[in-house]
Design a protein with these regions (language model features):
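A short, active-site helix/loop in glycosyltransferases that binds the activated sugar's phosphate group
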Residues: 124-177
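Nucleotide-sugar donor phosphate/pyrophosphate-binding loop at the beta->alpha transition
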Residues: 109-128
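A charged, aromatic-enriched C-terminal amphipathic alpha-helix characteristic of glycosyltransferases
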Residues: 13, 323-355
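Active-site proximal beta-strand in glycosyltransferases
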Residues: 74-76, 92-113
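Short N-terminal targeting/anchoring amphipathic segment
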Residues: 7, 64-85, 98, 271
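Conserved donor-binding/catalytic core segment of Leloir-type glycosyltransferases
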Residues: 7, 179-202, 208, 223-225, ...
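Nucleotide-activated donor-binding/catalytic signature segment of Leloir-type glycosyltransferases, i.e.
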Residues: 237-256
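A conserved mid-protein helix/loop that constitutes part of the nucleotide-sugar donor-binding site
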Residues: 13-20, 199-213
Length: 355
């Protein structure tokens, strides 16, 4: 008999795609999905077993949540961002061992990112109590699981899973013949992408300064900078800085665009620079590496360690140059990305978690 599984999800851009996966591949199994957030921003079709609450601070939503948590065999927490949910679970310790946490990144690194005020210290007491008792931890970045063990003294099981469709490579399998044809076109300048969002953890200014020390006028065509997701005030500041430093070569992406349109931009990129000091931008990174793009990131991050472990070549930000990687590296990276970051692998990993 299949386990009854409850998904509690902070509603973000990853979740509608995950709901599609559940409906497509696990339709005959007893899954309930409760999301909380702005469904107008991240819409999906609701049903009796898959539905949204705008907040978790009403009696009705909390009551339905508590009932659902007790009726299901396993609870999967998609992102641990809601203070209401953390506190609520702390007062039901008998549920903790059947809870698995899908680590997103920002929720794990909360102690680094949050403002250190009274609210932070109170919440960290609740978080430490809850996280230390959880039954499972879901992430494909092994370093993040080890960080959870170190920071929160966890003992729960590690489930390796790429979890969301945003981590599934959406491009083509590359052939040597196609690459030879592209190289024959002799493009004189490279296009660069910096960061993946308007989050200060992108460290845009640091990346801009590193890039500006290279031969920007003669070797760079465009500098793409995705800023549509995150802090709008910070986005405006980075747009202004980028235009000041790179002039008409700077292309800030300020508005959300359809995935197909965004993928066309990824196709144009030759070199990507990610200056994050933690695991972040993995969806972008995966799809750029799969497309044969040269990716630079900090070598002290868990994402760098993961990709290196998978045999995928990434370069240290300290060694930034405008030379693109060899054809052999392009082919090898594409093959490894296609094999690991596939929907087939995702579904198999989910089957293990759900069993």
């Amino acid at each position: 008999m299949n386990k009854k599984i409850l998904h509690l999800a902070y509603l973000d851009k990853f979740i509608p795609g995950f709901i599609e996966i559940v409906r497509q591949h696990f339709a005959g199994e007893p899954h309930t999905v409760i999301t909380f957030g702005d469904i107008k921003k991240y819409p999906y079709v609701q049903s009796s077993s898959i539905f949204n609450f705008s907040t978790l601070n009403s009696f009705r939503s909390i009551f339905k949540l508590v009932v659902a948590m007790h009726l299901n065999d396993k609870i999967i927490l998609h992102g641990l961002f809601s203070s209401h949910l953390v506190i609520l679970l702390c007062f039901m310790p008998w549920l903790h061992k059947k809870c698995d946490w899908v680590i997103w990144g920002g929720d794990l690194y909360y102690h680094r990112l949050a403002k250190k005020d009274t609210r932070y210290y109170v919440m960290e007491v609740f978080r430490k109590f809850l996280i230390s008792r959880l039954g499972g931890f879901i992430t494909y970045v092994e370093g993040d699981y080890h960080n959870a063990q170190q920071w929160y003294h966890t003992s729960g099981k590690h489930y390796e899973c790429i979890m969301y469709k945003s981590n599934v490579y959406s491009g083509a399998t590359l052939s040597e013949e196609a690459l030879i044809h592209t190289e024959g076109q002799g493009l004189p300048k490279v296009n660069v992408q910096i960061g993946n969002s308007a989050d200060p953890t992108n460290n845009h200014q640091q990346a801009f300064e590193k890039l500006s020390k290279l031969d920007v006028p003669n070797q760079i065509g465009k500098v793409y900078c995705p800023l549509s997701y995150g802090n709008s005030v910070y986005a405006a500041q980075i747009k202004k800085l980028g235009e000041a430093m790179f002039g008409d070569k700077f292309f800030p992406l300020m508005d959300f665009m359809p995935l197909a349109q965004y993928n066309k931009i990824l196709d144009e990129v030759d070199i990507a620079i990610f200056a994050h000091d933690r695991q972040q931008a993995m969806g972008n990174t995966i799809n750029l590496l799969g497309r044969g793009k040269t990716v630079y990131m900090r070598a002290d991050t868990s994402s760098y360690a993961l990709l290196t472990k998978l045999g995928i070549k990434v370069f240290s930000l300290d060694d930034l140059s405008l030379a693109v990687q060899s054809r052999e590296v392009v082919i090898a990276n594409n093959q490894r990305v296609c094999n690991y970051f596939s929907e087939e692998n995702l579904v198999n990993q989910l089957k293990t978690i759900f069993s």
